[in-house]
Amino acid sequence: GQGLTNRLRAAASKEKGATVFGYYVDDPERFGIVEFDGDGKAISIEEKPRYPKSNYIIPGLYFYDNSVMEIARGLKPSARGELEITDVNIEYMKRGQLHVEKLDRDFVWLDAGTADNLLESAQVVRRVQDETGRYIACPEEIAYARGYISRQTLLRHAEELNKTLYGRYLECL
């Protein structure tokens, strides 16, 4: 979707609290969900609820301030014996420091949480790359476009990978 980079930068620049993202799905019971009040403020978060109160999930992209360390130290293992990221988000919500950025429907999020979903996600990425002739999330391409690396550095990376399709892609940028 358009504007993701700006949203990520805004989330990363916040000095206080946490920012997570909300994404609308048709099958929220498979995910951690977030419920909103009438003003769009998060009022509950549940992990894989049997009866979801919302269709908005939290797809696993989190930005936390430094207090996350103190929050994490205070966590207790769940029934599964694990520390849950959902509990971190709930603590920020209780403190009034959780911001949920809703992603519009033009954003694409792919669930890769099962083997079948991972395969399906890979096929979607392949199809988009084949149709557009551009790689998705190519770190060297992004770094070069943003001026973080020089053309010389880009070509050096391409040379190191010259026997691969990826290396040839980098050479053509």
Model-derived segments and their meaning:
Residues 148-173:
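Short, amphipathic C-terminal "tail helix"
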Residues 1-38, 64-66, 72-75:
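Conserved beta-loop-beta/alpha segment of the NTase-like Rossmann-fold superfamily
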Residues 145:
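Short, amphipathic alpha-helical "recognition" segments used to contact nucleic acids or chromatin
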Residues 18, 24-27, 129, 141-142, ...:
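Preference for short coil/turn "hinge" residues that link or interrupt alpha-helices
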Residues 5-6, 114, 170:
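N-terminal glycine-rich phosphate-binding loop and ensuing alpha1 helix
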Residues 12-13, 41-141, 152-153:
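Catalytic-core segments of class I nucleotidyltransferases/pyrophosphorylases
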Residues 25, 56-57, 160:
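Generic detection of intrinsically disordered/low-complexity segments and helix-coil linkers/edges
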